[in-house]
Amino acid sequence: MMAQYLALKAEAQDCLLFYRMGDFFEMFFEDARIAAACLDIALTGRGEHDGERIPMCGVPVHAATAYLQRLIKAGHRVAIAEQTETPEAAKKRGGSKALVARAIVRVVTAGTLTEEALLDARAANWCVAVGEAGGDVAVAAADVSTGRFEIFETDMAGLGATLARLNPAEVVASEASEIDATSHRPRAQFDSAAGEARLKSLYGVATLDGFGQFSRAALSAAGGLVAYLDHTAKGALPFLRPPVLHAGDASMAIDAATRESLELTLATGGTRKGSLLDAVDRTVTGAGARLLAQDIAAPLMDAGAIGARLDLVQRFHDEPNLRETLRSSLRALPDIGRALGRIVAGRGSPRDLGQLRDGLDAAWALGERLHQLAAPPPLLAEIAPRLQGHGALIDLLKRALVPEPPIDAAGGGYIAEGFDAALDDLRHTGAGGRRAIAALEADYRKRTGIAALKIRHNGVLGYHVEVPARAADALMAPDSGFTHRQTLAGVVRFNAADLHEAAMQVTQAGNHALAAEASHLEDLTETALARRHEIAITADALARIDVAAGLAERAAEGGWARPALVDHACFEVEGGRHPVVEAAVARAGGRFVANDCDLSESSRLWLVTGPNMGGKSTFLRQNALIAVLAQAGSYVPATRAKLGLVDRLFSRVGASDNLARGRSTFMVEMVETAAILAQATPRSFVILDEVGRGTSTYDGLAIAWAVVEAIHEDNRCRCLFATHYHELTRLAERCEALSLHHVRAREWKGELVLLHELATGPADRSYGLAVARLAGLPPATIARAKSVLAKLEAGRAKTGGLAAGLDDLPLFAAVAAQEAEAVDELRTALAGIDVDALSPREALDALYRLKGLAG
């Protein structure tokens, strides 16, 4: 056995090997140590190898999915070695000592999951391959749970943005590539000619022209991905729809840093909660949620396609009764896309067929409702017919399956009564046999006088009589009619001729019934598979309707407006809000302050000043998010919006050290800013916050100054630039398209009041000390800062130099000494108070004295 295991382990390579032994998957050697630690299960031993005990652990087959989930989340890949014959077949083949044949039937990886329990219902699960050829780069992406297959042509500079858009579970590349990948595969699998042949074979075509014009890099990526999926499925290739080829300019370009900064689909920490997607998502199906995430990750550049999406959202927005009817119907839908994916992968169950039946039937009813609409929007008129056309399959599945089919087909019981007369007869025969066995139990009790006698069944003995050990002697007599089979602690088991006869009737009928059901299941599966492409199209149509209805619901909730999209590079937003922050403020019982933004040609660059916590960063981000939502086909959080299409979106807001790559916060900021200056076009939208911080004041100011000039003169894009360098406001004198704005704040009775309102002109002051006091800095520190600030401002007024006057500030200034004396006096006063002896009036007087000492 161990020789067989080692041979399979060599085939599994770097995967953990689940080796099937009866009702368990066993692991040995280093695999056992890794799995035991990861799964928190006992590490035992079995036999010896090279003179040492073999480490071993195992998990039950029936619970394997839960253990697989933990291993995959921990970053492992798992090869499944199943028994490919029964022990009886092995004995017939090679005698009583023959080893049961085993083979690896599947490699489970993060990107190739289809099991419902292992997947997030509301997120796509992409497995991607990166192909390179002649300096070009392409990414092929497949979600094997639904069959989506998409190809993106890019270059090395844009690879990161493409991968960030997909957020893949697994990345595969050639072993000759330097790309950071989850798995590197043989170079030959990424050969473009081999890739073309592999795709032609997969789709049974002589040419790929019907799918588009593929570059060599695209063929390399697609071929490499198909080869990898074939490897993990061990020849049972999962369902892949015809590939969709994406041109580089079909969607808004958003790099990885911008996605992270704006938290489009994932918030800080890698979770959905707190992201734009989380704030917008009102979908009621898993497929709708996955499609919405895709829409937000890749906003469109085609004004016509955006308008078609918006028309559909508007129809549902303007007709709340229709919207609620649709959402109520959609809410009850099963995920037919993923059910189909499991069926195609050979991992389908009777329940998956039941989900197809119920989902397609509900889709048909939904289509009937939509056909009644007068003047439907063009997109709805296009997709509504896709909801129907499955009548014959629905009728077959309705007749064939019970209302709630089981997940496990092994026990039968999923074919409906009346579908197959012969199967019904077998079931009646089996039921008759079970009634006969029940009658025998009553008869045996009467004959023997043993009230505790029971007829039981297990996989080893079959049907048998079981009595307490104290009553077994009565059945041991030769003329009792019972044959002893097994003695256990407390019970003794017997057989009887008439029981054996009845049991044979039940067993044979049951086996024949199971075989008949399995045959029907195979036929039903083949019938469904014949319509897999049409079913996938229906699933897509349902998802699009769910997305539109959900966006309409969100717009109605928040009073959002339909954006107007124009050809020229304008950006006019009235009453704009940040959807995530607004929701958080509302939960806290507050009210979000809306602001306008008008980046017309004459003021396409706004320089925004004002105090920290005043709302500058929120204002910058909210306008970037409005652009994303508009081009995704959504209403936007504003009272009015008129936007020119944005080809590239950049955000340099907030940064942190990238220690893994040896980059400081300032270095990260400069790299991101350099990318913006190199890539932004006049149609781009850029938000920049505090460029230049992290270095000396003069260096930072000089960099910020030069960046503003470059964006104004060279990139000429729409830009919101927030800064604390008030010196930059002088650029308004020489940059005709630069407009000055600030977030308003006021001091009231010594306290800072942040108004979160945007006003024209520069801020009159930074309010830095007020914000520091609001943040809780010690009074002594605030006082010292005031002293330093006064000297700095005096020096600046006298010499024009920022550092003038610093020489007059000793490390331990007089104010600090005075405050130290005040602290000592306060301590002395506190030490002289006998708290237990004070009356309430005396305590209040003492408190006032102490307050006077504290100033």
Where are these regions (language model features)?
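Conserved phosphate-binding elements of NTP-dependent enzyme cores
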Residues: 3-7, 14, 525, 539-543, ...
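ATPase nucleotide-binding head domains, primarily ABC-like/P-loop NTPase cores
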Residues: 29-32, 215, 284, 289, ...
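A conserved P-loop NTPase coupling/switch region
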Residues: 24-45, 138, 148-150, 170, ...
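C-terminal tails and terminal domains of large nucleic-acid-associated
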Residues: 823-855
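Amphipathic alpha-helical transducer elements in NTP-driven molecular machines
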Residues: 2, 18, 29, 58-68, ...
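Short hinge/gating elements
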Residues: 44-57, 82, 204-214, 263-266, ...
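Basic, polar low-complexity surface loops/patches
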Residues: 1-318, 335-341, 345, 403, ...
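Amphipathic heptad-repeat alpha-helical coiled-coil/stalk segments that mediate oligomerization
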Residues: 193-197, 202, 252-253, 258, ...
